[in-house]
Amino acid sequence: MAMDDYDDDMSSVGVTTARIENQHQQHPHQQGQHGHHQQGQGQSQYSAGAVKVGGWRYEDASRYIGEWNQRGQKHGIGHLQFADGTRYDGQFQEGLSQGVGCLWFADGAKYEGEFHQGWFHGNGIFWRADGMKYEGEFRGGKIWGLGLLTFQDFTHGFPRNEGFFQDCRFMRRRRCPEVVQRAQKCALMARSQCEHPY
């Protein structure tokens, strides 16, 4: 069988993510005394009445340490830890992951790269817990665009697929070294961004 004829179960990568957010979009200090987000505990530093940097532990056991905007939303650099062990370190904008960041899943999978409105979006690298690695373009939380998919072993047939992916499915072969390099650069920027004092 020629590589161009290759078609197996792994033409579908199986990477779809939930939007990186939790139910706590706002800092509890911005709500009224009986506001919905008042559960939890934390400490913050204030500047002219607005929360700038602080930490908060929510009732559902998730935690956030980082920067906030004047409306009480996660905004700037921060660390968000969910109760299941999933962790995001990186940039936030108005309560959602936005910019570059690193996301570690409880099952051992991880993503380093660009985010847009809470989704993997742009360029980055995703490692699945079984050793599969995708370096390339993402859209709306899915593998979508040009990229390189590799496996640590031959359990899924050919050890690499390079080309165009749509909705997590391998569509056609195409060399794309410039896209892979861009994904590697974004992942490196995300890793360096995650090295913060929180």
Curated annotation (Swiss-Prot):
Residues 23-46 are annotated as: Disordered. phosphorylated under dark conditions and is dephosphorylated by light exposure. The modification N-acetylalanine is found at A2. Disulfide bonds: none annotated. It is found in: Membrane; Cell projection, Rhabdomere membrane. Its main location: membrane. This is MORN repeat-containing protein 4 homolog. It comes from Drosophila melanogaster (Fruit fly). The lineage of its organism: Eukaryota, Metazoa, Ecdysozoa, Arthropoda, Hexapoda. The gene is rtp.
